[in-house]
Structure formats: C-alpha cells, structure tokens
Regions:
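A short helix->loop->beta-strand "cap" motif at the edges of active sites that frequently abuts
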Residues: 107-110, 140-141, 160, 218
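Conserved alpha-helical elements of sugar-nucleotide-dependent glycosyltransferases
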Residues: 11-18, 150, 204-208
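Short acidic alpha-helix that forms the nucleotide-activated donor recognition element
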Residues: 252-257
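A nucleotide-sugar donor-handling region in carbohydrate enzymes
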Residues: 70-71, 94, 115-199
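Hydrophobic/aromatic beta-strand patches that form the interior of the parallel beta-sheet core
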Residues: 31-33, 81, 112-114, 144, ...
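Aromatic- and Gly/Pro-rich donor/ligand-binding loops
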Residues: 1-10, 14-135
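Catalytic donor nucleotide-activated moiety binding site of glycosyltransferases and closely related
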Residues: 113-120, 151-154, 198, 205-251
Length: 257
C-alpha cells in the first residue's frame, strides 16, 4: 500500500487504517511502503510522533528505499494499491516523480488506485509531466477516485473511465473505530461539546468557531495537525471566547474519540 499513511494529518492516518482493515477483512496480507523521501527513524523521533507510533503498532512496513530503488519491491509483492487522499495533486506528488503513478511497478503486477484524488478541479501539472502521467495511468488495472472532479479529469485529460468510490473510512466497520476509541480510556471530555479539526487556521474560521460557540453555548475543542507552531495557529484564529479550548497534540485514538 503506497500513500500518506505516515503524515501528521489525522484524517489521512484514519483513512489508511480503514483501508488496511478492509484489506484484512478480504484476507489479503499487505505492507505499507515507507516514504521514499523519508529517513531512518530513531527511537526519540518515534516516541514523539503519533502517526509513527500508531503505524508501529498496527502495520507491516517495508524497508526504507529511495525512489530509484522502489522497483525492488516487485520482488516481494504481487499487487500494489495506491491509497486515497490527494496522491495525484501535482503540488504534492512532484517531489516523488511518477512513483505515485506506479512507474516503478512491473507490468506483470496488479496496480490499483483506490479513491485517489487530484486535489484540484483541474489538472495542474506541466505538459511533459502530463505525458508521463498519461502513460502510467493506462498501466493501471483499476482506477477509482473519491470526487467527481477527479473522475472528470481522468476522463477529459487522460481518456480513462474511473469509478467514483467512497473514501475507505466509510468502508471500515464502525467496530474497528470503537476499538481505537477504547484505547483512549484515559481521555474524557465532560458534557456536550463541538469538535473543530482545523488544517489551515485563519481569522475567518476563528470567527465562525466563536459564533457557533456563543450561539449554542457549547464548549468547542479545537485540534490542529500534530506538526507546526500551535501558538501561531491559535493567534491566526483570533478567538476570544472562553467557551473555546485547545487539545494541542492528541493521540490518534483521542482525536477519533
């Protein structure tokens, strides 16, 4: 499985957790392909990173291979699955070359994209990259996307009829999420509350949060991504309401709670 399972976005983490639970329910064995632009992780970094701790406890992970050696994985696997999220957003995929389009996967291996996305409502890569993308997309055995604009891009730009399928989080049985929540047994929030998970904090979002808190008279718990300057994020929201509090670095289980 190739994708953003190791990132600091809680939603991405849960997306790949859900995908792997579904694969297991179908009796497939799998491994997660390690970020080829990453580095070996020392124990201190592992203990600081919720995504990596979450992965360590739940996934088989491939050895760290640079992009020019990813083809070695063909020796170990019969099929490759590209996960959900904005894997085909050129702004995100550019550092990875064509690896997000499985250029390293041999012709005789099964290649599947599940609920992938271009992240934009139009293709934004340069023409030479589009030519390579077209060639590699036509090598896939199955392509599905999670949004209608990605489906349209596949059709209009590359002549591919992609299936429109839901994100893996909607395939995974709710019992699997309850198991994760049960592991957050020490994390409790008393009373009713509103949960706000903010990826790109700004004053407009902060004003909306404050308005909702004051109109409902419910407390709001705000969470940001694990990485980044949390104090700077709070300043960008410019929230003054005492009803709003911040849970700065919850575990994956606590976030799901």
């Amino acid at each position: 499985v190739y994708g953003l399972w190791y990132g600091n976005n809680y939603g991405s983490i849960i997306t790949y957790y859900a995908l792997t639970r579904v694969l297991e329910s179908l009796n497939y064995t799998y491994a997660m392909i390690r970020n080829p632009l990453g580095r070996e992780i020392d124990i201190d970094a592992l203990n600081r990173s919720h995504p990596l701790k979450f992965a360590r406890d739940r996934y088989e992970v491939t050895p760290l291979l640079p992009i020019n050696r990813l083809s070695e994985l063909n020796n170990n696997f019969s099929a490759f699955v590209l996960g959900s999220d904005q894997m085909w957003n050129y702004n995100l995929s550019r550092p990875y070359g064509q690896s997000y389009f499985f250029d390293f996967v041999a012709d005789d291996k099964v290649k599947i994209a599940y609920a992938t996305s271009f992240g934009k409502d139009k293709y934004i890569g340069p023409e030479d990259e589009k030519i390579r993308t077209d060639r590699n997309l036509h090598r896939f055995d199955g392509i599905s996307v999670r949004d209608d604009f990605s489906q349209r891009i596949c059709k209009d730009e590359f002549g591919i009829s992609a299936e429109l399928l839901s994100d893996p989080v909607f395939l995974c049985p709710v019992e699997k999420y309850n198991e994760l929540i049960a592991e957050a047994s020490d994390f409790k929030v008393e009373g009713d509350y509103i949960f706000a998970y903010i990826l790109d904090p700004n004053e407009k979002i902060g004003a909306s949060i404050q308005k909702i808190a004051e109109e409902t008279q419910k407390k709001v718990i705000v969470v940001f991504n694990e990485s980044g300057d949390k104090e700077s994020f709070k300043e960008r929201l410019k929230i003054s309401s005492e009803l709003v509090s911040y849970e700065l670095v919850p575990t994956v289980n606590e976030w799901l709670y």
